């Protein structure tokens, strides 16, 4: 895997990141864990997430993707080996 500097942070991130917008809706936790394991084994250390994930946003699943990522990091250890890019959409009608 090729790694690139993340600005002037001193961090190096993999040239590829793992997108997670389906974790918690289209993919259950076991499937998400398998995808995260595969990404780790391929040398990926960069995960893309968002507070509104999974897509399509629903009040009952909002934030579930980040919960799954957190559970995976806790179960696998070494959370400092990862860079997680996340974003916030902000208030939306019908969402908490």
Question: Where are the language model's segments positioned?
Answer:
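A short acidic, helix-capping loop that chelates divalent metal ions and anchors anionic groups
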Residues: 53-57, 91-96
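N-terminal binding-site loop/beta-alpha segment at the start of enzyme catalytic domains
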Residues: 1-83
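A short, structured active-site edge motif that brings together acidic residues
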Residues: 81-92
